[in-house]
Amino acid sequence: MALDQTALFQKLLEQIALPADVAHYPGFKTGQVEQVIVHETSKRWTFKLHFDNVLPFAVYTAFEEHLEAAFQAIAAVSIEISTDAKELDGGVLAAYWEYVVNHSGIQSSLLHELCAKETPYIEGRKVLLVVENDIVKTFFINQAQTTIQAGYKRLGFPNFAIQPLIDESASQKSIEDFQAKRAVQDAERAQAAAEAIKKNEALKEKRKTEGKPVDGPIVMGRGINPAEPVRQMISITEEERSIVIEGFIFDKEVRVLRSGRQLLILKMTDYSSSFTVKKFSRDASDESLFAAIDKGMWFKVRGSVQEDNFMRDLTVNANDLVEVSHPKREDTATDGKRIEMHLHTNMSQMDATNPIGDYVKQAAKWGQPAIAVTDHYNLQAFPDAYAAGKKNGVKILYGVEVNLVNDGTPVVYNLRDQVLESAEYVIFDVETTGLSAVYDSIIELAAVKMRDGEVVASFDEFIDPERPLSAFTTQLTSITNEMVHGAKKEAEVLAMFKEFTGDAVLAGHNVSFDMGFLNAGYERNDIDLIDNPVIDTLELSRMLHPEYKNHKLDSLTKRYKINLEHHHRANADAESTGYLLYKLEKEAAENYDMVNVNQLNDRVGVGEFYKQARPAHAVLMAQTQAGLKNLFKLVSASMTEYYYRTPRLPKSKLDALREGILVGSACSNGEVFEAMMQKGYNEALDRAKYYDYIEVMPKAVYAPLLERELVRDNRALEEIIRNLVKVGEKLNKPVVATGDAHYLNPEDAIYRKILIHSMGGANPLNRSKLPDVHFRSTDEMLTAFDFLGPELAQELVVANPQKIADQIDEIVPVKDKLYTPKMAGAEDEIQTLTMNRAHELYGAELPEIVEARLKKELKSIIGNGFSVIYLISQKLVYKSGKDGYLVGSRGSVGSSLVATMTGITEVNPLPPHYRCSNCHYSEFFTKGEVGSGYDLADKDCPECGTPLDKDGHDIPFETFLGFHGDKVPDIDLNFSGDYQPVAHNYTKVLFGENNVFRAGTIGTVADKTAYGYVKAYERDTEQTFRGAEVDRLAKGSTGVKRTTGQHPAGIIVVPDYMDIYDFTPIQFPADDQDAAWKTTHFDFHSIHDNILKLDILGHDDPTMIRMLQDLSGIDPKSIPTDDPGVMALFSGTDSLGVTPEQINSKMGTLGVPEFGTRFVRGMLEETHPTTFSELLQISGLSHGTDVWLGNAEELINKGVVTLKDVIGCRDNIMMDLIHWGMDDSMSFNIMERVRKGKGIPDDWQQAMRDNENVPDWYIDSCLKIKYMFPKAHATAYILMALRIAYFKVYFPIIYYCAYFSVRASDFDLVAMAQGKEGVKARMKEITDKGMEASTKEKNLLTVLEIANECLERGITIKMVDIEKSDSSDFLIQDDHTLLAPFRAVPSLGDNVAKQIVSAREEKPFLSKEDLSNRGKVSKTLIEYLTENNVLNDLPDENQLSLFDMM
């Protein structure tokens, strides 16, 4: 049954969880919810409530705050109240006054000054408000009275009118005094705010270093008795009145509510689960504590647990919070500290969670002197490890865990001279209790004796293992306990088999396994080991057929049509293997002329042998700086030359580059441990000879081996470890105890579980329970090896790792300076190019300002070795221009006049000036009186009468190379997207293929991806996590390496006097062995300061300019930059011949780069720019952070300054301050700090205030800015934009053809072909969805806006034509018609579009069937084209005519 309005209000009170003192307000008993209006588009809910009387102000604000907080995840809220009140209460009226004014939406300093000074009062039946003069009275009546009265009405007040009353005693002087006082107060408040921010930041920094506030632990509310029981978070599953929890803060947010109060939102965990904790501030004291609370702190919280009905989650509403200390893991060992020599960071792909910095910091706290990094297959943590080691004073051991492979596995063991065809063979197979020849035993031994391909005898015996078989063994082998119980003993069966084999050639599939068990049994029973030749059919198949995906016995017998039943029963396997052997030997003779046993190993290690070899883990540790370079080469080879499913490293490659590298035996996946586990001491001893040190790990790390029954029990595991220690002693090689760390603390294990779970069943780690592999302390490791005795444990855990670390040099993995390539004569060429062009433009005798600027720049560029960087860029730009593609510059390169003179950029950074192309007269404007040379009035040369060129944008060189000109130049160039691959490949011509690489990137798990992993883990493990716990688990799973990639534009250039391995290993992006370019293995940011990176970007603007030029024949460089028709676009639509209503935009800039978005069009509507320099301002304002909104916008709207005067681009700051007389160096430094959002130091602020030319608003504006755009970048972009806009105004069909061809990727051809009505209907359909519109629909809406404008300007868009349409570009059919390309058809990709055109060029399509077959067009696309009358002339099927038959 529906609740009545009063009951609804009571339900609402429960949901928003008001504090008890407010919830019991008597007036709430009769409160009603009259209506809730849901505004879907704006995501706002309006609550219409009714009460008997107006609520006390404190009650209202508390109610509003909790209502906002309760609905924060759903929508914004607003409240409208009606009451039965007939009379006004003066006290209540006054209490609400400031709130009503602040929420009126009226942005007027006059009103807010009035609010601060006066309050309305009741006199008789009137409500009066004292004002000072007629100006204020008129303002209040015209602009504020109605709005404020309506504001009171919405809060439940009865109707009334506020009458302004002039205070006759107030003189003009008092007004001026008041304003002066207010100005002082404002300045004081601004200063106080700045100081508060500084104090807050200082407090945070202090907390980071000290861990607690200056005056002790934080306490909010009442203290919490230490004896009060603390609930484990996972135990709380329903609402409770009062509980205490204790947890670690992993996320924090402070929200400022409309009332001005603050809401603290903490996310806390005790690692059993997590909770969201909320608390409202009561006063300024609470707010200061809110600021002091930070992530990483531990708190006890007492409060109530309540269900958030909308979020459907339990949250804690805190009453009391107390900061507490939390016990941390310690390393209390006194007899030396351990060194971890096997450790994985978050660069071990999807397998470890913590960055190396976390481990190094912990090692430092524990007093551990060194730490190794040994990620799987990669070295990508090295740069961060180096930085962390320097910061924390910990020595870094640089290593990697690789997949080591033998250079081919023998096909035959125990070679002898024996003709294959005439040999007698015994093909044997064993079934065993497990995989270890040492700890398991044979339970069935079967064989067949064969001559000439026929079975002549057989052998099949069970062996009693003298212990019950496990369920796993029975499942795998089909052998039961009943079958082996009471069978012959091992000694008897093996003696019989030895006699059966005689002198025959033995064979088997994966025979090394069977040989291992057979020889182990022979050894136990004093029988001679096998010395017969033993052929492995697995390796013989791999040698003959490396192309096969697998070489399993069942796969091969099917391929060779050999019947195989009861696979994994020894007798069936042996016979099948025998027949397979004869077929393979026949192929070996035919293909490779192998006819003798001695020949079968001749091709071992030939070809792509590494693909067939079984990898084993090994750790490679750089011992010297030369060893590090060898390590770089080895890892590069494993990722490029020997990659197969994973990077692999042949032993021969390691042997060739082993100098300066120590090789460790690694984990249970290493060959030494595996040999000990499966084949015994002697085999492990033999394998260990290859290694420099032997690793053993805690039994907990080997736990999966027990679970998978690879090791029988704990005693067997201890025996393996003891025997590995004996191997080390026997070979005089150190044995070290390592932890195989994959995360920092035990509680972090869940993150690794989630990551590995996300990989699915393909990841072998998902097949058993994950071991405990946290970063262990010395104490933990000594305890883990206490079964060896204290002395030996100390040796393995502490002494031996220290000995190895002492053998390793202090190694530097990244360079400490920039190494640029050398080009012979680069300095002279740059000087010549620069001066030749300067003289060409400015005459034989350069103007002083030009000469001084060039001298200054060339000295910096040549002196710091940057000439080659400029010359490379010049050659790239020159070639692109020669090939017909303009290049746009990005960033600050346009700040360099040398870049302008050498043709790298079109942007001229000199002050605005006139320049005569005939007699070289020039006139410069150096005092900031003109914003851009393009804004100068047209003028003829006073010397010769030639129309003067206009140029110069007043951009300081310092913004590019720093104040001292020694900052490495970062030249970013925008090439056409079509031309970008050509430009990239041209670098190979310039420097050689082995000296250029793509800049590598590392893709890590992002927030949304991690969230998906957590939800999948929650679902698959049938658990339920609170929202806060999902957030914690997702946060812990982010940042882990997921893949690698390449920077879309970055080309790394290696100088010819070095090689790439001096800087970084190399690889293919995302391990794609077919990729066209190799990339740096290190993320390019890690080596950015050491090696030159060219940014050769692909951009749509140059592509569009090229297409416009091709279609029109107009040279884009000839287009004027001050065309009135083009400039009119930025203040209206008249130059397009349409009204704003027709195109749904007041500005004509739809589709104009930089100016087409709704945000920028809104800026244009407010500012109406008319000059190039004002467009520069718009560009800077729109790209900056906190430069327009809440800053320049307010200054313009309040009339403080106009658009041309506000701070737009970063360079403006330096030049403005210099023009105002401030020191050049300080001006530069202020600009640098402001553009990075770092504020301005107090002494610099004072210097600005002391300069009478610097306005106060300018300083305040600087203090708000977080990021600023470079003026050179804005200039280059606007140049391109104006050229494109020129075609939009004067050549519309060419413009729309180019726009749709180059910039648009989402189309609705049906709507576009229907004309204006169809497009407008589709636009409305999308806009009506509001926030629910998909990204694809939002992108489509942008294209539809342009299509609508195109149609309104009289241009028709036609559906595709099967005979005429292009694959990708729109075509101009006549002056008013565009024909769509095939790629504009939904779901018709580029490849199919090209195939249609290619097939059409061969011959016309005869039918829809023909189109489908030759054009590769799907049935769905055929239906689309048919429905839209594209295929009207085509029959469904090919029709055979009489003439076709003749």
Curated annotation (Swiss-Prot):
Subcellular location: Cytoplasm
Highest taxon listed in the record's lineage: Bacteria
Pfam family, any one: DNA_pol3_alpha
Family classification: Belongs to the DNA polymerase type-C family. PolC subfamily.
Example of a GO cellular component annotation carried by this entry: cytoplasm
Organism: Latilactobacillus sakei subsp. sakei (strain 23K)
Keywords: Cytoplasm, DNA replication, DNA-directed DNA polymerase, Exonuclease, Hydrolase, Nuclease, Nucleotidyltransferase, Transferase
GO molecular function, one term: DNA binding
Protein name: DNA polymerase III PolC-type
Described function: Required for replicative DNA synthesis. This DNA polymerase also exhibits 3' to 5' exonuclease activity.
Alphabetical list of InterPro entries matching this protein: DNA_pol3_alpha_NTPase_dom (IPR011708), DNA_pol3_finger (IPR040982), DNA_PolC-like_N_II (IPR024754), DNA_PolC-type_N_I (IPR028112), DnaE2/DnaE/PolC (IPR004805), DNAPol_HHH (IPR029460), DnaQ (IPR006054), Exonuclease_RNaseT/DNA_pol3 (IPR013520)
